[in-house]
Amino acid sequence: MYKQSLLKPNTLFRIFAAFILLLIVMLCLSLFNYYQALVQSRQASLNSMASRLAYQIEDYRYQASHIYKIANNKSSTPSADQLAVTGIRHDIFWLSSANQSIDAIVFGNNKQSSNVLASKLANYMEIVWGARNEYNSMYYLNGLDNTLVLVTTHSILKPELRFKESYLTLTAEEKRADMLTQSTLLDRREIISNIQKYSPDNLFYYTYRLMFNSPGQLTSVISFDISINSLIPPNLNGDFFTINTRPASTGSNEPHTTWVGTNLIFSHPIDGTSYQLYYHVSLKSIIFNVIGYNLWLMTGMLIMIFFALLIMLFIRKRLISPNTNML
């Protein structure tokens, strides 16, 4: 005689439903755990970069102070006869020298004092930048005569100057006007710009400016265009970095992670300054990242859920109800 099953019609169905729900919860927890690890990894990388950026700014703060002393030191002046000056335009002059990686350009009148100043700055920056294989530039706006001096390591500067005008020379007047405007800001002696990109060489840099006031003359401004390619961690994209002033509402110096619209924004204060480093990640990028790194896990879980559904429906239809199907 057939013995009636002790299982009620919906018991086994509910067991498999609970099993499927458990698989879904496990999948969601795994994805959330990866998301948390992703956020922590990005924040740790940003913290590391902000620390290195703070050291870099401190270094250039010292270099700027030392450069200002060199520019105003009249005791050690190189011989003007040794300077070879090439006129690029009526107001742009290139100083050729023995330096292999540094170029000096004077914007303004071809005066001996300006050429000597450019030579001294180039010789000093050769020591600072000579061993670095990266893009860096320095603009020195002399408060005595409003002369602008450019010292740069740009690798293609000489060919551009010989055959066509460089973007560095074309933007000189804009640089001068910008530096003159910022020199009138009495409440700000130090200014850091947002991160910019030079697309032809895929270079990311920011501008660091320091103002120096001396009695009897206009403000002298030293401006560095500093490359950060060597500071960017491998798991971060330079296109998504920004530098802005620290909000007044931020009372602590701790890093923060916040959602603004569909963007996840990581932030970390730059020690020794009133600025903050930000990194933006879009929701779309996070979704693709999470799915891409968990594709096989999700595939396996979905296959298990699919087979569990098939078995649950088969048992409910064939083995539980009606009992006559079991004969």
How does the language model describe each region?
Residues 138-221:
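Extracytoplasmic/periplasmic ligand-binding sensor regions of membrane-associated signaling proteins
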